[in-house]
């Protein structure tokens, strides 16, 4: 009896475990449904700030960005990443249609390339392109304290 159990465990252990990936869902709606959803239904899932933005309507510039992203995706060969699309529209809200695109988001100095992933839905492009250099707290500068008069200048 014990020998039979050992054999089944060995047989089960011989097969490699298949990796399972978590299916992405935004507020309980899976990605496939999000892509098929109309804009009005999608807006109902967004937080209040994003809902207000969409209710006021997408103006000319955001629509132009979406058209450029569509064109870049269409022109890309199958299985390849699309060409990056540069933009200054840091206040653009990421929608499911943009997933898989590469956007160059301007931070005031350079265009930071951002690949749009499903987890980014509902966020602003600016959140993924930092516009300042984070402070590195270190040694005090010249004139910071009275004792700094005795620090030799470099």
Curated annotation (Swiss-Prot):
GO biological process, one term: translation
GO cellular component: cytosolic small ribosomal subunit
Keyword Ribosomal protein appears in the UniProt entry: yes
GO-annotated molecular function: RNA binding; structural constituent of ribosome
InterPro entries hit by this protein: Ribosomal_uS19 (IPR002222), Ribosomal_uS19_CS (IPR020934), Ribosomal_uS19_euk/arc (IPR005713), Ribosomal_uS19_SF (IPR023575)
Domain of life per record: Eukaryota
Keyword Ribosomal protein among UniProt keywords: yes
Entry keywords, A to Z: Ribonucleoprotein, Ribosomal protein
SUPFAM superfamilies: Ribosomal protein S19 (SSF54570)
Annotated HAMAP family: Ribosomal_uS19
Family, similarity comment: Belongs to the universal ribosomal protein uS19 family.
Name of this chain's protein: Small ribosomal subunit protein uS19
Organism: Oryza sativa subsp. japonica
